[in-house]
């Protein structure tokens, strides 16, 4: 195999301890292995024409299993195909076959199924059926065209007949027209239902009609006004209650104004004299004072 692990793959001197035999370990007489092998790596040199065929059969081409045309990993151009240009991919010989070996090229299913082209018998059957179908279609098309022409002629003849018959204008005098109108009126009067007449009995004749002086509207208006008056009286009774009980302060409490922001040191509510529940106290207002409660004066 090629040189040792320490050296580069392909032709050249192996410098490290490697498995197998290096090229320079085998022949010490070769001064330049790259020149003597003409750039080809491996144990075998390029031999003469007679021996080159044997080497290509054994190794599969110019290169061995390791060390290709320019020191590649695997053999260069196998199957006897020479390189037209450097670096080109070799042509694959069996392109028609599946590379994986898992294809279904041998399963034909007698020409049917997916991926099959059918059988030659199918092509023959189609060729024989096509002209028959074409002939039948042509005959059917001619029949349909003849039927349409016959229908068109029938329609033209039927359309021409009513045009020839024009409606006759009826003429009448004024007297005849008035007679027709009178007959129509009489017929309408006969259709109208007769008015029903009430038969007055003796009891109905003895009765008298009494007119009610009070209309219904007036009654409803009076009822509404009475309800409103009652509501007003109840509201007045509630208002007349004294509110002294609500204005009296509880025991131990003094009314005071709420303090504003203090101006001294200590921001926030309640300064030097502005806290809630200050020293100043106010008495409850008296309801009897006319100046404070002018609306409670007896009218």
From Swiss-Prot:
Keywords, comma-separated and alphabetical: Cytoplasm, Nucleus, RNA-binding, Translation regulation
Localization of this protein: Nucleus; Cytoplasm, Perinuclear region
Superkingdom of origin organism: Eukaryota
Stretches of Basic and acidic residues bias are at 45-60, 86-98, 134-146
- Per UniProt, the ranges with Gly residues bias are 1-21, 61-78, 267-278
Listed transmembrane segments: none
Region: Disordered; residue ranges are 1-173, 232-299
Please name the InterPro entries in this protein's record: HABP4/SERBP1-like (IPR039764), HABP4_PAIRBP1-bd (IPR006861)
On tissue specificity, the annotation reads: Expressed in seedlings but not in roots.
Its predominant location is: nucleus
Which GO terms of type biological process are on file? Answer: regulation of translation; response to light stimulus
In its UniProt record, a GO molecular function of this protein is: RNA binding
Family designation: Belongs to the SERBP1-HABP4 family.
What's this protein's function?
Ribosome-binding protein that acts as a regulator of mRNA translation by promoting ribosome inactivation. Binds RNA.
Q: What is this protein called?
A: RGG repeats nuclear RNA binding protein A
Q: Which organism is it from?
A: Nicotiana tabacum
Gene for this protein? RggA
